[in-house]
């Protein structure tokens, strides 16, 4: 009578995940007993690798909002359903006791904007709320389930808007934005109420949803955001052995010491973090740049004070399939446009235009940001940290960065850049984080 659902971003985020192309996490999901999965960073591997992993996955991999391009289908690229064009199975029906529950999959809609399309050139993504409504109506008419649940990687705000515009969904169980939401959030729409849930990330919580289904309807439910205190849970011997076996061929490299730290190295804030600052500082130092830009990723584990930084630790912040670095001259006006564009992806008033992630991390500059302002007006007072000079719109600056989504950059992978920096530093202390001046967000618990 129980289903175990995985909200995505599971096959990526460590050295072994990168080196095995996600296979290590597929094996872990199988051991955990996952029933249904959706994706986002799963699609940062090549399409053939994604499909190979799905074949090895015991769980069903669902996505109602990924389609095979028409010209790709004409060239022989396979689809789950050639009539609809769905690349993957869009939904499934599960029988739990006497109840029949429909689960619809929703992948991250902006995957090919936020991540390289070159890895998955034959698939299109989108929110596809009209397709969602058509699918919900079809399931109701043809399958007549007792409950309809969407397993989503939209992000919390986008899920709330989808709950407003799509009717007939009972619950949306969401991922992507890493929000640990303590209660099921009710959203009214024209046919009733849809509850939106989000369970944080990285195994910190589980969403536990108990449904009381009687006579073909949900009579009542109980929602629990269950914290996971890993140190209090006895380790599973089978899982422990699996992890040890996965890591064994790489153990010497993973445990290789690089430097030490007297500060907590973390990636947690919407605008910055000490790990991100190290990456930004490394880009400036190793690349000889004035300014650095690093993506606003949310994944990665922390390193505690007085701990040795190992290569494994570094890879939890950088292990990805497009890690290449760059250094090039960029005009001040373009730097502002980059900051404005990322800010609009995050703070656009329309949740369907929010592409998720956190604000791009910066090194060598500080700035003021008003998230509630209009695009083009959010970023002001950009200043060079070293000299205190204001950024000149007409002047070119040497900018270093990594993780380009379009064309592949030609530089070394970012972990090599950061390792060089850390080895030179030997010991990390008194990190000065380039924190923007954030205005207009007092009392907003979602911005830190």
Question: At which residue positions do the language-model features occur?
Answer:
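Acidic, metal/ion-coordinating pockets
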Residues: 1-230, 270-282, 292, 346, ...
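Generic recognition of stable, solvent-exposed alpha-helical segments in well-folded globular domains
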Residues: 24, 45, 89, 127-130, ...
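General structural signal for secondary-structure boundaries
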Residues: 43-48, 124, 155, 232-237, ...
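Feature captures C-terminal
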Residues: 58-61, 65, 69-72, 77-91, ...
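Short, solvent-exposed loop/turn motifs
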Residues: 100, 264-265, 390
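Glycine- and acidic
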Residues: 117-121, 261-269, 316-325
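Short, solvent-exposed aromatic-acidic interface loops
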Residues: 222-235, 384-388, 404
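Hard-cation-handling environments
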Residues: 227-310
């Amino acid at each position: 009578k129980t289903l175990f659902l995985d909200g995505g971003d599971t096959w990526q985020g460590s050295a072994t995940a990168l080196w095995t192309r996600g296979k290590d996490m597929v094996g872990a999901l199988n051991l955990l007993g996952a029933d249904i999965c959706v994706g986002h960073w799963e699609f940062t591997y090549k399409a053939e690798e994604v499909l190979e992993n799905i074949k090895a996955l015991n769980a069903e991999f669902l996505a109602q909002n990924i389609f095979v391009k028409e010209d790709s289908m004409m060239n022989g690229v396979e689809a789950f359903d050639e009539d609809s064009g769905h690349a993957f199975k869009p939904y499934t029906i599960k029988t739990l006791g006497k109840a029949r529950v429909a689960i619809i999959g929703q992948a991250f809609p902006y995957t090919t904007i936020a991540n390289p399309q070159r890895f998955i050139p034959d698939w299109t993504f989108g929110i596809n709320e009209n397709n969602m409504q058509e699918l919900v109506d079809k399931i109701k008419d043809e399958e007549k389930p007792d409950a309809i649940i969407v397993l989503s990687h939209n992000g919390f705000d986008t899920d709330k808007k989808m709950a407003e515009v799509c009717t007939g969904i009972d619950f949306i169980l969401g991922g992507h934005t890493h929000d640990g939401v303590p209660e099921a959030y009710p959203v009214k729409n024209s046919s009733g109420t849809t509850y939106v849930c989000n369970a944080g990330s990285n195994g910190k919580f589980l969403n536990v949803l108990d449904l009381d289904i009687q006579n073909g309807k949900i009579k009542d439910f109980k929602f629990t955001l269950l914290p996971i205190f890993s140190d209090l849970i006895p380790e599973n011997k089978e899982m422990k052995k699996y992890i040890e076996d996965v890591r064994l061929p790489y153990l010497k490299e993973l445990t290789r010491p690089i430097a030490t730290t007297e500060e907590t190295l973390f990636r947690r804030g919407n605008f910055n973090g000490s790990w991100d600052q190290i990456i930004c500082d490394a880009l400036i130092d190793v690349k000889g740049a004035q300014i650095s830009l690093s993506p606003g990723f949310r994944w990665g584990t922390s390193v505690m004070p007085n701990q040795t930084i190992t290569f494994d630790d570094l890879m939890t912040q950088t292990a990805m399939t497009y890690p290449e670095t760059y250094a090039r001259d960029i005009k001040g006006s373009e730097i502002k446009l980059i900051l404005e564009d990322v800010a609009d992806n995050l703070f656009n008033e329309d949740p369907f235009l929010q592409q998720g992630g956190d604000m791009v991390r910066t090194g060598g500059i500080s700035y003021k940001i008003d998230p509630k302002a209009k695009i083009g007006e959010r970023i002001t007072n950009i200043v060079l940290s070293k000299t205190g000079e204001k950024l000149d719109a007409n002047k070119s600056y040497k900018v270093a960065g990594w993780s380009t989504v379009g064309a592949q950059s030609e530089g070394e992978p970012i972990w090599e850049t950061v390792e060089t920096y850390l080895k030179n530093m030997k010991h990390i202390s008194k990190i000065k984080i380039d924190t923007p001046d954030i205005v207009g967000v007092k009392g907003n618990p979602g911005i830190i």
